[in-house]
Amino acid sequence: MSGHSKWSTIKRKKGALDAKRNKIFTKLIREITIAAKIGGGDIESNPRLRVAVSKAKVANMPKDNIEKAIKKGIGGNEGVEYFEITYEAYAPYGVALMIKCLTDNKNRTSSDVKSVLAKGGGSLGTPGSVSYMFYRKGLVVYNLEKYLEDEIMEFALEFGAEDILVSNNEAEVITNPDDFDKVLSLLRTKFKEEMAEIALIPENKISLNKEQAEKIILLIEKLEDFDDVQEVIHNLEIPEELS
């Protein structure tokens, strides 16, 4: 009986992990397809596609899936038109959210986002009400279990990075967006990053206690459960015990 119970638990956990992975792949495929449609299928000349493919590789997406998504984008993606929408919103305790979406149905997405925000104690803001709290920068993230903090700092600054932020065993290298490709190429001669993209960086982060932070994280996770939501950017300082 206990063996059967254990197997059932393993199956449930595996099913949940598979479902989560499939959801991530769906979002990444959509982003790759749109990037290829807008900027072409050449990774070297299409920065957005290059970032999308890099994310897909980090997520261990099969190469065949990536190539099919690019071909679909180049082919025009007939029959489906996606729209890019970024909702500005507030979570409880004044935490700012930028909810980036890719959708083929604006009304559905708007309704879903509003519903989840309302249930989680948040609300939609007006355009410009939240975006001013973030600035656009190049972001390269390294795992400090793999590399020495001092080593990353030394080379990143030498290669032209603007700043290096360290927290929760990660080093975040910040660059001017115009210098991002150059700095990343130089860094790749020394290190392998966990993530690299042009990102929205919060100007200031909000610190909350563990219970409050958990409420915000749950709201963000519920938003990201929707296929239409590609990413939720926030200005919450995640407590170390929750990272």
UniProtKB/Swiss-Prot annotation:
Predominant cellular place of this UniProt entry's protein: cytoplasm
Protein's GO biological process: regulation of DNA-templated transcription
Top-level division of the source organism's lineage: Bacteria
Keywords: Cytoplasm, DNA-binding, Transcription, Transcription regulation
Gene3D superfamilies: 1.10.10.200, 3.30.70.980
Pfam families: TACO1_YebC_N, Transcrip_reg
Listed InterPro entries: Integrase-like_N (IPR017856), TACO1_YebC-like_2nd/3rd_dom (IPR048300), TACO1_YebC_N (IPR049083), Transcrip_reg_TACO1-like (IPR002876), Transcrip_reg_TACO1-like_dom3 (IPR026564), YebC-like (IPR029072)
Compartments where located: Cytoplasm
Family: Belongs to the TACO1 family.
UniProt cross-references to PANTHER family, sorted A to Z: TRANSCRIPTIONAL REGULATORY PROTEIN YEBC-RELATED, TRANSLATIONAL ACTIVATOR OF CYTOCHROME C OXIDASE 1
Protein name per Swiss-Prot or TrEMBL: Probable transcriptional regulatory protein BAPKO_0024/BafPKo_0025
Origin species: Borreliella afzelii (strain PKo)
